[in-house]
Amino acid sequence: MRRLPVFFVLDCSESMLGEPLQHMQQGVQQVMQHLRQDPYALETVYVSVIAFAGIVRTLVPLVEAFAFYPPPLPLGSGSHLGAALEHLMDEFDRYLIKTTEEVKGDWKPIVYLLTDGHPTDRCDNAIYRWQKRYARRCTLIAVGLGNSVDFVTLRKLTENIVSFEHLNEEGFKKFFQWISASVLSQSKSIGDGVEQNPMLPLDERYLQIVKDVQRHQGVDENCVTFVGRCGKLNRPYLMKFDKELQYASEEVSAIK
């Protein structure tokens, strides 16, 4: 049976601290629960999870859906997207089965790249390598979380860019339901011997296709994260501050 590889490449930088990281971890578990209930997915889908911050690590190598065990997502400083791309391409070379005269290889892999900010390393060489050797060999869906995403860089990787700004429990639930439905639809179609576009229609209350990357550029003014170091133990720690909006009464806020 030919495999359908699915890679989750997840930004676990300090800006994801708190509920966003928890919701992302729960979302991956939600996807796997849906996949395990589908006979087509159980036969074809193989899943890998790669986390990146200042370093990149494979948390789960490419495994069958029924054997997948959801890992705890780490948290780190920095967002090395270039290193994450290099790591992903190395994983492709190491684990994907190519079609030869003797054997049919894997179906076209699907990659879900989730990031909420700007790269903190140089991406040019990784992007060049990606476009030259890998971009046509897989479907990369880049998802920008929040309102401070570098969509210009993501556009250099793929035309499939999704903006997801509702980083609450309900928003994450809808988002990962969309991923589940997309993977299930693709696994069923290849079960019938046909590959289709894994991008299903979006629920535009939560998700939007990004066409004009310049218009979506921005900086999150409602959150700031600091990296500190303990003076006693000399160990790093993170501090995240969210702006709490204070709404004044009409009388106070009226223009005089």
Regions found by a protein language model. Give the residues of each.
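Cys/His-rich microdomains that often coordinate metals
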Residues: 234-239
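Von Willebrand factor
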Residues: 1-60, 67-107, 110-114, 121-122, ...
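Von Willebrand factor A/integrin I-like adhesion domains
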Residues: 147-207
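Short, flexible, mixed-charge glycine/proline-rich loop motifs
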Residues: 214-225
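Short cysteine/histidine-rich zinc-coordinating motifs and their immediately flanking basic loops
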Residues: 240-248
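Short cysteine-rich clusters marking metal-coordination/redox-active sites
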Residues: 227-233
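Arginine/glycine-rich "motif VI" loop of SF2 helicases in the C-terminal RecA-like domain
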Residues: 39-40, 131-138
